[in-house]
Amino acid sequence: LKKDLHEEVIKGRLPGGSYSIRSAWPGIQLYYPPIKYLPAEERYETEPEARARLGKYARSSEAHTIIFDLEDGCRQKAGSRSFLSSVLPEVRQHIPGNVAIRINPMGTPENKLDLKLIAEIYPYIDDVMLAKAGEQEGLRDLSELANFLTGLSRNLRIQPIIEHPLALRKAADIFALPAVEHVVFGIHDFSRAMHVQITPGGWQQELYPFMCSLSLEARL
């Protein structure tokens, strides 16, 4: 997979240049639960167990970005925030790629706690992934997040997650934001919103028209 992605970057370069139309493809982005559920034992990890797992897997990962998820995939939100606050400053130097935090939608109670965490650990992260971007408040939620992040560091980037047709309609405006280099296509929530039944082996074809629309906006 990594080899194929690198080949795609090379194909995307303009003739005679060492750059692409936009910035380089972000590569492999791996979702990583800060606190993991252990189904065999019907419990969640303790902090020492989560710390040991992070040391074993995330440090040796070849992913270009490790995404610490605080949204839908995270059932222990408070514990995960506490864990990242105490552990990430210590282990960040050992993670070879970028670090991203996937946060809850702007304006929600969980989001306010997510932003408080980011204010503590921003020197150790590269990207903030915003769930449900552009759905309810249009670009206001992204502008609000961008202003918050700029107040911390101008190097922090936003990766909006496109999970609804309303957000797809605003894709051109989303890509025009200075803090946005890439977006993430949230296929599961998007397909549910469109009442499209996707399958594990055919989702690319089933969502092909929407992926083409998003790819076009990404290239303009």
Language-model features, listed with the residues they occupy:
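Expand to "…catalyze enediolate/carbanion chemistry for C-C bond making/breaking, isomerization
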Residues: 1-220
